Structure formats: C-alpha cells, structure tokens
Amino acid sequence: MSPGRAARAEPIPCVITAMADEFGGEIPVGPFAIIGDDSIGRGIVETLRGSRSRAVLMRNHGPFTIGRDAKDAVKAAVMVEEVARTVHISRQLGEPLPIPQADVDRLYDRYQNVYGR
C-alpha cells in the first residue's frame, strides 16, 4: 500500500494512535532521486531531519525506514505497511480523521518515555 502513496507523493496521515506512538506524526514524502549515487540517502536524511518519523516514502520509489538496529527498522517497515493499509481501507468509508497534533505529541511522549518502562 505504501508504494502507491509514494507514487502519488502523498504522506500517510496520522489517523491511528499506534502511528502516533511509533512515528510521532505523519509519514512524510521525500524527493524523487535517481538510484546509483547518494541522492536517495541524502533525500531520506533531509526529509527525516527534524521529524520524529522513522519512515519516509521516497517519491516514486517507496518506503525507507530507520531504527536503532536492523530489527527496529524492520518493525518500522511493517508498521508503515499496516498504517498505509488502514488509511486506504478507511478512505473507502470516507475521509479519515487525523489525530490533533497536541494529542499526537502526548501519545508519542508516553509511548517513547513511559510505556513499558
């Protein structure tokens, strides 16, 4: 589901609490880049700089994720596909309702700093 959003240069809006917990907001879209040099890497870094998201949809490519280690990056990749699917399904019923940023901030802080500790 996420490559379709990358093809449209459409970020994944933060519409479920699990997404607020894991990504701290929407999953952004990075620029188009030609494979073969460091353009994709630079685009990923520039897009995620200043963002809490561990995922980016690179325009016309698809999702890229980062993490503390490989397992964490794979967890983020699985979550990207799950939330992309959720948004796609919810759009069949109408426009999904984004979580207000103040609530996203509270959810992210609780999950990252309190939950499970």
Question: Model-predicted segments: where are they?
Answer:
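Glycine-rich flexible loops
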Residues: M1-R117
